[in-house]
């Protein structure tokens, strides 16, 4: 029998917010049922309207704030209410950190079934103009005869929020969004550009135009003139990721760069490579990870999900040898390139399936005293399940998803005999609910 959808009550409701969800939405309890309301803060009394009725929870749209929280601040971005790029600009920066730290510790307790012996002080950076990588959507609107450039709408990802600025983006692109829009508006084929990837190094900013059809000579000229006037490297992507090429300057090498000044290391990377979006926080994160590793000259370290060597190369300056393993062959090539350009010789890199620890062991027949793990959001489940075959005395786990960190912590602590010494958050993404964290495990 077909289920009948519950009818929405469209009259406004009033409720007090009692908590925050993992994604930063306010939680109200209405007749014992959780209602999630974007933009509401704990302690506030809000007026809202139901937008979705589910079996176990409801969702609502914030209409007004009857009793505001002292933690509430005015969002800096004029597009904040619609844009899906940020979710916490209405909360003070200090409270954002407390929310993320509390969320991490709650997950470690609930799903990791343990608590750290100590909690690290949060790592923070500048809250604005920190983001060095982003993807801007573009769409030419026939009715308006103008181009929209922006991020997806928070409540309807099918649509684009047209923006004139973005205060979390690298300061250069923040001020040039309006010029990007004007560029596309003047092109002969205004439907050609589907999206624009932004990637910034320490000294240069690159734009990758995803062109759905070949550019006309006139449009190529306009892009060159734009790049020259506003000082961008421009890449074109006419097909898949392997089709990206440097379009302007035509004689330029394809790499951007960033530096870890404390270690006198400079990394070169392609705009499509994975790099941390927040350069200032990344520098602090690398230093904290190395401090937690407590490296000795005799240590041989395994760096899993090593990427282009962001942790491997600075660690190599403090130990006997580092072996980096990465699933992406292109990143392994980049890691070797960076080791060579920085004259670091006590590192080796391998491409392997990181869900198969035995494949890693067969590639690298070495004993490791310490391991650093920096996995994607899916975590490192297969690695921690097979950690006995590596048997390190110390593990530093850098996480971009506290839920999978908590899951993997449960295995390490309650099945593999490790102790969670310390853990804490790193605010890689201010004004969003994304939680980056770091944890130290010691063999019990």
Swiss-Prot record:
Query: Which residues of this UniProt protein bind [4Fe-4S] cluster?
Result: 77, 83, 86, 166
Using the record's annotation, list all stretches that form the TRAM domain: 5-64
Catalytic center residues: 400 (nucleophile)
Q: In the Enzyme Commission scheme, what number(s) does this protein have?
A: 2.1.1.190
CDD domains membership = AdoMet_MTases (cd02440)
Q: Which domain of life is it from?
A: Bacteria
Q: Which GO terms describe its molecular function?
A: 4 iron, 4 sulfur cluster binding; iron ion binding; RNA binding; rRNA (uridine-C5-)-methyltransferase activity
According to the UniProt record, what class of enzyme is this? Answer: transferase
Q: Which UniProt keywords apply?
A: 4Fe-4S, Iron, Iron-sulfur, Metal-binding, Methyltransferase, rRNA processing, S-adenosyl-L-methionine, Transferase
InterPro entries recorded: 23S_rRNA_MeTrfase_RlmD, MeTrfase_TrmA_AS, MeTrfase_TrmA_CS, NA-bd_OB-fold, SAM-dependent_MTases_sf, TRAM_dom, U5_MeTrfase_fam
This enzyme catalyses:
uridine(1939) in 23S rRNA + S-adenosyl-L-methionine = 5-methyluridine(1939) in 23S rRNA + S-adenosyl-L-homocysteine + H(+)
GO BP terms, alphabetized: rRNA base methylation
Q: Which residues bind S-adenosyl-L-methionine?
A: 276, 305, 310, 326, 353, 374
A Pfam family assignment: TRAM
Task: Identify its protein family.
Answer: Belongs to the class I-like SAM-binding methyltransferase superfamily. RNA M5U methyltransferase family. RlmD subfamily.
- Functional note: Catalyzes the formation of 5-methyl-uridine at position 1939 (m5U1939) in 23S rRNA.
Protein name per Swiss-Prot or TrEMBL: 23S rRNA (uracil(1939)-C(5))-methyltransferase RlmD
Organism, by scientific name, is Legionella pneumophila (strain Corby)
